[in-house]
């Protein structure tokens, strides 16, 4: 028998060279978890484990996401405020066009002017994370209606709405950065978080050449876009 190729399955219990063992039973799951904890699973194996877990938990993840989405639409002050302001501009975001789905890329959500908001149910850590993500995407929706954002070709537009969404959604507040992302700074923390996340978002767009290009575009619009807190009177949280 020939040696197993990288990423292929060997003859020992289905285990691959990545350290990941396919299977949904409890024993196999524990073996995979211990392989991760002891450093015996490669990054490729960890990704295989994550994908299998997300597929296995898809129905439960989406149900939890939908329940939390509906609760936030009814009771969250920031979500209700953004919903009201979007409605005043002629838009409508509610459970019929805020979708909870399993995503294959590592992102929390997205906004599409034609279809609405996508929430990646398999990436949501808790209801607070879902609230931040909804608020972020709803700021994009507000900007689309209020400022006629060119999502396709204008990187300055993209940078501006990313700055505003990261700043106003709450995802860059100190507690979120400190406890979830391990950012320990006390001074200028909010601004640095907003800038970092805006650069990452712009960098991922097709028209952006590289990180230096993304940083340049963000810097060009930073002052005016960071100061613009509409529809809030100030940064809400």
Curated annotation (Swiss-Prot):
Pfam families per record: Peptidase_M76
Keywords: Hydrolase, Membrane, Metal-binding, Metalloprotease, Mitochondrion, Mitochondrion inner membrane, Protease
Enzyme class, broadest EC rank: hydrolase
Compositional bias of kind Low complexity: 1-19
Its biological purpose: Has a dual role in the assembly of mitochondrial ATPase. Acts as a protease that removes N-terminal residues of mitochondrial ATPase CF(0) subunit 6 at the intermembrane space side. Also involved in the correct assembly of the membrane-embedded ATPase CF(0) particle, probably mediating association of subunit 6 with the subunit 9 ring.
Record family assignment: Belongs to the peptidase M76 family.
Protein name, per record: Mitochondrial inner membrane protease atp23
Organism from which the protein derives: Neosartorya fischeri (strain ATCC 1020 / DSM 3700 / CBS 544.65 / FGSC A1164 / JCM 1740 / NRRL 181 / WB 181)
């Amino acid at each position: 028998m020939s040696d197993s190729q990288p990423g292929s399955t060997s003859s020992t219990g289905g285990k691959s060279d990545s350290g990941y063992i396919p299977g949904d039973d409890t024993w196999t799951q524990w073996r995979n978890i211990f392989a991760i904890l002891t450093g015996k699973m490669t990054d490729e194996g960890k990704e295989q484990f994550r994908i299998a877990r997300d597929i296995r938990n898809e129905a439960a993840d989406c149900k939890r996401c939908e329940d939390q989405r509906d609760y936030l639409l009814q009771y969250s002050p920031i979500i209700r405020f953004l919903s009201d302001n979007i409605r005043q501009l002629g838009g409508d975001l509610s459970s019929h066009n805020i979708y909870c789905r399993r995503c294959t890329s590592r992102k929390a959500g997205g906004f599409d002017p034609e279809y609405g908001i996508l929430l990646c149910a398999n990436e949501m850590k808790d209801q607070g994370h879902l609230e931040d993500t909804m608020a972020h995407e709803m700021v994009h929706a507000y900007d689309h209606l209020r400022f006629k954002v060119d999502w396709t070709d204008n990187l300055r537009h993209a940078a501006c709405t990313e700055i505003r969404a990261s700043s106003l959604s709450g995802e860059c507040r100190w507690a979120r950065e400190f406890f979830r992302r391990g950012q320990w700074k006390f001074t200028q923390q909010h601004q640095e978080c907003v800038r970092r996340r805006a650069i990452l978002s712009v960098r991922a767009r097709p028209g952006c050449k590289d990180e230096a290009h993304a940083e340049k575009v963000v810097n060009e619009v930073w002052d005016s876009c960071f100061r613009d807190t509409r529809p809030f009177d100030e940064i809400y949280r």
